[in-house]
């Protein structure tokens, strides 16, 4: 019986040693900060919308006689799918999207997308981006958050327009190509 009592006594002494710090132990405190982000489900950009080629058309350089002259607009669409719908527990009032267009700004009018440089490139104009209400969106600017009109599958179309806009009175003919990137933020 004494042997069993001794085992429990040793256990109790060890437990007390670790559970109740001695006054001689260091009083250093350690702070551990955890950070992270919890994302709600967002929409997926469809494969066909990721790498688009928009045909801007062929125009006579003489159609751009004054600074600010524009060509007819060409529409392009960014299709998104699988967005959370109003029935979802993630969003109760639908989904809003903000599209940010990035690219090289024109040297004369920084709101326009600069044409790609080359020996046979047109000069004196850039590409203007418009929303579906014909409101200009500056390159490296944002469309602003707008509610997406989702179908029952959570799919939506974001429609924008592009057009040439002259930055000089003397527009020189040539290739008028450019590269535009976009990112979409959801809320």
PLM segments and residue spans:
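Mature extracellular/passenger domains of Gram-negative fimbrial/pilin and adhesin proteins
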Residues: 2-8, 23-187
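Bacterial N-terminal signal peptides
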Residues: 10-19
């Amino acid at each position: 019986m004494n042997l069993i009592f001794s085992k429990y006594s040793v256990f109790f002494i060890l437990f007390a040693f670790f559970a109740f710090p001695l006054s001689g132990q260091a009083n250093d405190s350690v702070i551990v900060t955890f950070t992270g982000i919890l994302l709600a489900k967002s929409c997926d950009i469809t494969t066909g919308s990721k790498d688009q080629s928009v045909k801007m058309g062929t125009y006579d350089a003489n159609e751009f006689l004054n600074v600010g002259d524009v060509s007819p607009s060409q529409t392009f669409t960014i299709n998104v799918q699988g967005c959370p719908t109003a029935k979802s527990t993630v969003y109760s009032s639908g989904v809003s999207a903000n599209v940010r267009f990035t690219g090289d700004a024109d040297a004369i009018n920084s709101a326009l997308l600069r044409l790609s440089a080359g020996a046979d490139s047109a000069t004196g104009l850039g590409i203007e981006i418009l929303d579906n209400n014909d409101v200009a969106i500056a390159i490296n600017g944002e469309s602003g958050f707008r509610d997406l009109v989702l179908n029952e599958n959570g799919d939506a179309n974001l429609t924008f327009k592009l057009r040439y806009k002259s930055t000089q009175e003397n527009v020189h003919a040539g290739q008028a190509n450019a590269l535009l990137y976009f990112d979409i933020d959801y809320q």
